[in-house]
């Protein structure tokens, strides 16, 4: 029986490995070849069918000056230009400026649709036969951001508008919407948990291997009052943290997100005046400047769509000259304030650093009336508790602080319990059903001398495996995702 089982197991693993190879890179390569072949075939047919358009394009390309604008060339050589470049990327404004007023594309796709107003979207929608709208209605809406200085405290005001995403939610039945189920950006679940819970996303997040150093909460102890949403001691701490990151982690991209525009400006002024000329900082900035993730200092209104390895989130708000907390948190106080926090709290891929003169204990619940300030306190509490938790409690300590979060883990079967006891008798720590959002790993194992530093993940061929809807999910994608997050996989 033993040899028979081993032979069957070996044959099954060989079959799985063959499937993974054919369903993975081989399948992608085959699809790419088919697309290239179809593209080249279509292009040759179009060039043969429209020789006058080819002549027009060549004539314009050879001109040294007085070239026709794109709209005019497109009107004269539409079929050929779309054949050469079947996929165009542009903003709705550019679409209205250069595209003919007719349906020239088969599909129009909007990305980050929550930030596109309906009037701006209509001009692009009219250029296509079908429409796909992708976006997150719980992130920033289109915003007209302006500032007032009515008194010594800085108050940012925003006027939010409805987006094309809001309109589509009304026009299209729920069954016409496709909801994403997984979050892939953050390599540690704690970097997305606050958004996942507070905004009711119910996304499955993948447990990361390094469960210790993804979160920092740096409290700035100061008696200096905050003015107009910025504290000078916090500004200094932010600049020091930027410098430290650029020196010790040059391989990681970085963005600084300030809660208010005035606070952002103060950080920029100090950093570029006192720090920029340091050699390691110049080297870091040059290294990242021409990439898709350059170093930037931004505010809540301008960071949507960005992602970086490390995010420094600087609060700025604090106490006045009398030592009292000022509950004026700019756009966070207003409608959609929680959506602004959601954007800021979900930009990090590897590390989130919170810098603040306030802790969650400083904020009185009775003073927090709207959703934005309430989530602000939850954010401070989550990251502070998680950062201060013992190593063997990281990943769960912060989660337990969040309201209305009931984490139900699947029960263990007798075989799993027996294996857990066996591993523990060998002197290791075993954490069953490891994870924070439903994408559980059956067991993770650590040494008693180094709790929280996971060495190994153990997965069983059990109920979850057999309940997977497709072989791709079961045998390829789950392993691929876990390996991407640092886990070594053994079958």
Regions found by a protein language model. Give the residues of each.
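Conserved nucleotide-binding/hydrolysis micro-motifs of P-loop NTPases
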Residues: 94-95, 137-141, 147-148, 184-188, ...
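Core RecA-like ATPase module of SF1/SF2 helicases and allied nucleic-acid translocases
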Residues: 212-353, 427
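Short beta-strand-loop-alpha-helix junction that forms the active-site gateway
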Residues: 440-479, 484
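ASCE P-loop NTPase helicase motor core
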Residues: 66-199
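Conserved helicase motor core of P-loop NTPases
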Residues: 151-252, 271
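Conserved helicase NTPase catalytic core signature
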Residues: 1-104
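Helicase C-terminal subdomain and adjacent C-terminal extension
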Residues: 147-178, 196, 271, 322-434
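Short glycine-/polar-rich loops that comprise or flank the Walker A/P-loop
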Residues: 104-105, 127-130, 172-177, 212-215, ...
